[in-house]
């Protein structure tokens, strides 16, 4: 058998790779748990999105459409860059962190970050909250990336390319059929909650989650389109631009993780 991180030959009795130190035991458990936990970020942000629609905004805080959408793009790319740098420089060292500690740290920081983004009217505080979500999520992504061979592996490269193509495709779909995405909110939320509960049960039972990965990938693809559409319905302020970037980031990051699992299982 081969190490999922460095692809070197290892013995079935090895608990850690002799070459890179990657954890070999419990190979499926940690990624399955990470998928279910990271999906909860979208649930946590649901009420915040609803509040932003109804929010009364000081007219002086409104910025132009170009500045608003430009801020969303810059903040989103910042999050993706942070994730890339974590994958690049943390690498296999991520396996020295207990997966449970990693997940608990993500949940705690993500809750704090999402609350900061939702409650603060200061764009700087909102951006700090954004980073409190992006950095621990980036460490989770690093774990998943190294689990499937690192940045240079075929699985990771293909997952990134497919994620990029789907994100661009969903953006185009929003421009073509915005009314379709305007009706998806309640249905997407219900399916997501059901999916998380289903995955938790399957994880406890030790069932390999291939079908749910495909369902989740489709769900997060639709979420990308939905959150891009919703971003244009909020009052156009710097604070809402950061919050919208967080929504879209979570969609894209979760889609990437699911595609990693799909392509990894395929191999």
Question: Which residues does each predicted region cover?
Answer:
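A hydrophobic alpha-helical transmembrane-helix feature that marks the membrane cores
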Residues: 2-267
